[in-house]
Amino acid sequence: AKTLFPYTTLFRSDLAGKTMMVQSTTKPEEIFLAGTDPRIPQFGELLSAEDRSVQYAMLNCGYVDAIAAHEAAILQYMQDCNANFRILEEPLLVTGIGVAFALNDTRGLDEKLTETFAAMRADGTMKQIVGKYLPDPEKYLEVDALEP
């Protein structure tokens, strides 16, 4: 999540009572609406928008205190639009990205892709590619920390 709060270091607890915006039908919306994660403070208000670009406009204009979105997407927005936001020190959620294949696909693409990704990780290719687009690429390759 990004915010314009005037704190040097920003933690989840700093979001208590604040207005948060998420994109509709996303994992952040699901987590915040469920209200079952004790690590997430009670927000003053939770707003959802169908289009994620609305989140950035609302944050830029000060209509919301923070947004919750994938960190890579926020970093890309900041780079593309010369925006200056801060990211929470503690992630709200760590997720992997999946690739789906048809159940009846017999080409073995899932195994080939898994093998290729493992080789790219082992030889540093994946780190090099991610590093071209994002600072601190190791942070985005911490897939071993994910639950199976």
Ranges and model annotations:
Residues 31-35, 58-60, 64-94:
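A ligand-binding cleft/hinge motif common to bilobed small-molecule-binding domains
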Residues 12, 26-49, 78-82:
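Ligand-binding cleft/hinge of the Venus flytrap
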Residues 15, 58-60, 99, 113:
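Hydrophobic residues within well-ordered alpha-helices
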Residues 3-10:
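Short, small-residue-biased leader/transition segments that mark boundaries at the very start
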Residues 28-32, 75, 79-133, 136-148:
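Periplasmic-binding protein-like
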Residues 6, 23-26, 52, 68-77, ...:
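Beta->alpha turn/N-cap motifs
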Residues 46-57, 61, 95:
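Short helix-initiation/N-cap motifs at beta->coil->alpha
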